[in-house]
């Protein structure tokens, strides 16, 4: 379908794919993509050819499936993965009886989950009102970025779509910044904050280029000025 939509030459140059699907479906899609891009994902590559941003389906986030997820990620050593369940899904993957409710508990959980993926990959946990936590394998540290509406919770109307949109914004920031996890996490939280301000999709003004009355730059600048001091390692 992607080849028909974009054409093979363009698709072969696409380096980032966001997947929201099961383990089996993810494996099949990755294998199909690599055939089109003409490289073996089970072999180490001399240059980065494909990054998969994997948002697992909620129903596969069970402790019994963690070894299978681990096997899939570690089996495709020629691909970079950004694995991103939310905090509730992460807790089920690790066999917790309940979802962590504090930032410190989420940090501990993120480190534990990261231990189950190969060292060249990132683990991004979406923690709702607590923001996002990313394990940076290169710096060997956690990066916490607060939720966009930390100071304005009264503006949150409907959280539906916040997680999906976070990863869309994260992917955009990650690509534009050439892999800067801090920038990507900020973009993810900014976009997610916009999505949850109403029921349904945000109001788009094509003339002013605003979502719910604010441009992306205005939202980005607001986030930087209000939350950047909260970055924690």
Language-model features: where?
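Generic detector of well-ordered alpha-helical segments enriched in charged/polar residues
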Residues: 3, 27-31, 70, 217, ...
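Eukaryotic helix-linker segments that join adjacent hydrophobic helices
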Residues: 1-7
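Conserved beta-alpha-beta core of the PfkB/ribokinase-like small-molecule kinase fold
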Residues: 14-111, 130-131, 137
């Amino acid at each position: 379908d992607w080849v028909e939509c974009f054409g093979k030459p363009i698709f072969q140059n696409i380096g980032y794919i966001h997947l929201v699907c099961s383990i089996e479906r993810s494996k099949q899609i990755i294998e199909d993509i690599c055939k089109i891009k003409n490289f073996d994902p089970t072999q180490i590559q001399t240059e980065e050819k494909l990054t998969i941003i994997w948002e697992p389906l909620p129903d596969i986030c069970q402790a019994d499936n963690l070894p299978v997820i681990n096997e899939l990620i570690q089996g495709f050593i020629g691909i970079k993965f950004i694995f991103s369940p939310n905090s509730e899904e992460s807790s089920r993957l690790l066999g917790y009886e309940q979802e962590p409710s504090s930032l410190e508990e989420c940090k501990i959980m993120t480190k534990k989950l990261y231990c189950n993926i190969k060292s060249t990959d990132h683990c991004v946990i979406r923690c709702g009102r607590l923001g996002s936590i990313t394990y940076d394998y290169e710096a060997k540290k956690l990066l916490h970025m607060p939720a966009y509406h930390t100071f304005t919770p009264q503006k949150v109307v409907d959280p539906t779509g916040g997680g999906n949109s976070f990863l869309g914004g994260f992917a955009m920031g990650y690509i534009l910044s050439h892999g800067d996890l801090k920038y990507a996490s900020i973009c993810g939280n900014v976009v997610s904050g916009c999505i949850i301000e109403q029921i349904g999709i945000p109001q788009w003004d094509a003339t002013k280029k605003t979502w719910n009355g604010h441009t992306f730059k205005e939202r980005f600048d607001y986030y930087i000025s209000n939350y950047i001091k909260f970055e924690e390692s």
